[in-house]
Amino acid sequence: MASNQSIRQRILSELGSSGLNRFPPQVLELAFRRVEREYAGQITESTNREKSVCRRRATGKRGQFHFFLRHYFGHYFGSPFGPQQKALIEDIQALRGRQRDPVKMTRALSRGFGKSTVLTLCGTLWLILTRTWNFPIIISSSLESAKGFLQAIIDECEDNAVLLEHYPELRPKKDQKGQTVSWKDGDIVFQGGARILAKGFLNSIRGKRRKESRPDA
């Protein structure tokens, strides 16, 4: 978004300072403020429209995981997806809307093809935002490894400005006093109500719940 200073500089460059010298400073200030308000309104309207369109294309009723990856996580995917990645993306897309049907899925990808990024990071967030998952658990060979995967999710939810602007429900939840609840390295709860746990292969997950919700993935 352009700053007020840059807006004024643009007006001056287009109109020329010589033509403005005949107006009192107070009149110019009022004129500048009016233009700034109108410009800010246009920017806000354009931003809201973009947000609505992107949310619909990514996580709406017919939202596509492929668009979600490209639009919000383009910094991970600089090249076109290969056949193995496309197959995994299609698998994740197919999980949507299958909350009631238990699903077991196995998909092998070559090393370095982004298994963890596509599924554990982006796939987990997309399935939460589409309300397919509400309480997933990330299980890895060790607790530290699982925490590393969860930390990647935390990093994106803290630093990915476009993702946060379009999905504020991915911010940390607030307590009854309205204060932000700090995330733990193995357990995070979002404003939207979803929760993610990180566990090692030998750690017990029995009895885990969030209010009335038990782990669903």
Model feature map: region roles:
Residues 1-113, 117-217:
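Short, flexible loop motifs at catalytic/binding sites
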